[in-house]
C-alpha cells in the first residue's frame, strides 16, 4: 500500500512531472555530448573505414571481373586463331598430299612409258635379228635349192624330192 500511496501522491506514472522531464533531458544531452566527444568520432571513422573497405572490395571485384572478361576474350581470340591455324595446316597437308600423289602418278606414268618404249625397242631389235636370221636361212635355202637344181635334171620327181629335201633341211636348221 505504501507504493500505491506514493504513486497516488505523485500523480501516477503517466502524469508528467516537469522536474523529471527537465533532468532527463539534461542528462540525455550531457550523455549525447560525451558520446559525441568520445565515441562519435571513432564510430563514424570506423563506419567510414568500413565503407571504404567495402567500396575497395567492390572496385576490386569489378576490376577482377573486367580482367576475367578480357582474359576470356583473349582466350576466345586465341582459340579462333588456333582453329584457323589448324584448318590452314589441314588444308596445306591435303594440298601437299594431293600434290605428292599427283607427282607419284606422273612419275609412275613416265616410268611405265619408259618401260614400254624400252620393251618396244627390244622387240624391234629381236624382230630385226629374227628377220636377219630368216633372210640368211632363205638365202641359204635358195642357194642350196639352186645348187640342187643345177646338179640334177628338172623332172617332176626330182623337183618334188628337192622341195622335200629343202623342207627337211629347213626344219632341221630351225631345231
Curated annotation (Swiss-Prot):
GO terms for cellular component: plasma membrane; proton-transporting ATP synthase complex. F-type ATPases have 2 components, F(1) - the catalytic core - and F(0) - the membrane proton channel. F(1) has five subunits: alpha(3), beta(3), gamma(1), delta(1), epsilon(1). F(0) has four main subunits: a(1), b(2) and c(10-14). The alpha and beta chains form an alternating ring which encloses part of the gamma chain. F(1) is attached to F(0) by a central stalk formed by the gamma and epsilon chains, while a peripheral stalk is formed by the delta and b chains. It is found in: Cell inner membrane. PANTHER family: ATP SYNTHASE SUBUNIT B (PTHR33445:SF1), ATP SYNTHASE SUBUNIT B', CHLOROPLASTIC (PTHR33445). GO terms for molecular function: proton-transporting ATP synthase activity, rotational mechanism; proton-transporting ATPase activity, rotational mechanism. SUPFAM superfamilies: F1F0 ATP synthase subunit B, membrane domain (SSF81573). Keywords: ATP synthesis, Cell inner membrane, Cell membrane, CF(0), Hydrogen ion transport, Ion transport, Membrane, Transmembrane, Transmembrane helix, Transport. It is a single-pass membrane protein. Belongs to the ATPase B chain family. The chain crosses the membrane at residues 20-40. InterPro entries: ATP_synth_B-like_membr_sf, ATP_synth_b/b'su_bac/chlpt, ATP_synth_F0_bsu_bac, ATP_synthase_B_chain. F(1)F(0) ATP synthase produces ATP from ADP in the presence of a proton or sodium gradient. F-type ATPases consist of two structural domains, F(1) containing the extramembraneous catalytic core and F(0) containing the membrane proton channel, linked together by a central stalk and a peripheral stalk. During catalysis, ATP synthesis in the catalytic domain of F(1) is coupled via a rotary mechanism of the central stalk subunits to proton translocation. Component of the F(0) channel, it forms part of the peripheral stalk, linking F(1) to F(0). This is ATP synthase subunit b.
Amino acid at each position: 500500500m505504501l507504493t500505491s500511496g506514493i504513486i497516488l501522491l505523485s500523480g501516477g506514472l503517466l502524469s508528467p512531472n516537469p522536474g523529471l522531464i527537465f533532468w532527463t533531458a539534461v542528462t540525455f544531452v550531457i550523455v549525447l555530448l560525451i558520446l559525441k566527444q568520445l565515441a562519435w568520432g571513432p564510430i563514424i571513422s570506423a563506419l567510414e573505414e568500413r565503407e571504404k573497405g567495402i567500396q575497395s572490395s567492390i572496385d576490386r571485384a569489378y576490376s577482377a571481373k573486367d580482367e576475367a572478361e578480357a582474359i576470356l576474350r583473349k582466350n576466345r581470340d586465341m582459340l579462333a586463331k588456333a582453329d584457323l591455324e589448324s584448318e590452314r595446316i589441314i588444308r596445306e597437308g591435303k594440298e601437299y598430299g594431293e600434290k605428292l600423289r599427283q607427282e607419284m602418278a606422273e612419275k609412275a606414268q613416265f616410268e611405265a612409258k619408259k618401260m614400254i618404249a624400252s620393251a618396244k625397242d627390244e622387240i624391234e631389235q629381236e624382230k630385226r635379228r629374227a628377220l636377219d636370221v630368216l633372210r640368211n636361212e632363205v638365202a641359204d635355202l635358195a642357194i642350196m635349192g639352186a645348187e640342187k637344181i643345177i646338179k640334177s635334171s628338172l623332172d617332176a620327181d626330182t623337183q618334188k624330192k628337192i622341195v622335200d629335201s629343202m623342207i627337211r633341211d629347213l626344219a632341221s636348221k630351225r631345231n
